[in-house]
Amino acid sequence: MLETYLQDLAEVVNLDCGSANCEGVTKVANTMKRHFDSIGFATELVDLGPKAGKGLFATNKPGAEKFDIMFNAHLDTVFPDGTAAARPFKVEDGKVTGPGCADCKAGVIAIFHALKNARKEDLDRLAIAVCYNPDEEISSLSSREWLQQMASKCKRAIVCEPGRATGAFVRSRKGRSVWNVVVHGVAAHAGNNPQDGRSAVLAAAHLTIAITNLQDLEGKGTSVTVGVIEGGTVCNTVPEKCTLKIDTRCWNDEDGREIDEGIEALAKQNWGDGITVEATRVSKSPAMPCTDATKELVEMVNRAAKEEGYEATWVDAGGGSDANRIAQVGVPVIDGVAPAGAGFHSEREYLRVDTIENRVRTLARVLQYL
């Protein structure tokens, strides 16, 4: 199985398929369509609009209205055209390298090989949905609605982002909000009449401290990061404008709402005569909590891993993925179940060859417990 897995992986790694390369992403979708056609699955290329390549839906039960499980991975990478030729697929010293080899081509191929090698009785008994989307690396802007519609038809979901370098799976992910806060002041000459100015930068500095204090790192595990401060034009002018760019993270959506409301409340406070503040939430990604239903899925993977001869380990991740969007519709979901790797989004990306076979077999074995 390892040899054919690597052959299939090489084919898709050697295709340029950055999110903006719709043609390249669609080539990957067509490649996987061919693979699933070969094992008797019904397949459909999914048109998700002009800003994304095609997605792919595959199922062993065409016409099913509900599914026992959804498998998801994304077809796109972050890399520009030409990267596949410059850094093609390679296996060396127990590692696979090449653009997207781990994130997320390893998961794309792992799902196919797990279902290719699944027991016939499991495929006969279960309705399985495979959803490959084309734009996860740009927040699934074109595909999130489709993913959530499909997830709402499924009892549970497994997202095959790569496992951690240690081999750990992911049982929960933080939610995220991104905010732009613009502070307006009054410009004045710094030498002649500074008293007539109202410094937007000074007000923004005080506001930065107040916004940061909304976090509760030790208690709730929430974080608020003012990552960018842009203000002023030249040093001899009292600055009339300053912009804050803010990232917030939380383990559950209730805590996220509290922080969002806190930022809005601070923006309405008085930060000085002549100072006004505008706060705009640019984006929001829901949390992926480890619910009781999620824990049941975790235990299925633990059992499958043990029967494959290894102990599954789990992490709670601060970053997000499509699993967050799937969790938003109330479906229990786990992530990071594909073969393990590291160095994602860089030339240092690699996939651990020693994790390929046991991850694929684990995915196939989980079907026995559904």
Language-model segments: residues:
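Acidic/His- and Gly-rich active-site-bordering loop/insert found
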Residues: M1-P99, K120, A323
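Metal-dependent amide/peptide-bond hydrolase catalytic core
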Residues: C17, P162-G163, R171, N180-V182, ...
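Short glycine-aspartate micro-motif
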Residues: D68-M70, V96, K155-V159, N180
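Acidic, glycine-rich active-site loops and adjacent beta-strand->loop/helix elements
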Residues: L75-D76, K95, C131-S139, E161-R164, ...
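Glycine/serine-rich anion-binding loops at beta->alpha junctions
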Residues: F79, K95-I109, H189
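Acidic/histidine-rich catalytic neighborhood of metal-dependent amide-processing enzymes
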Residues: C104-K174
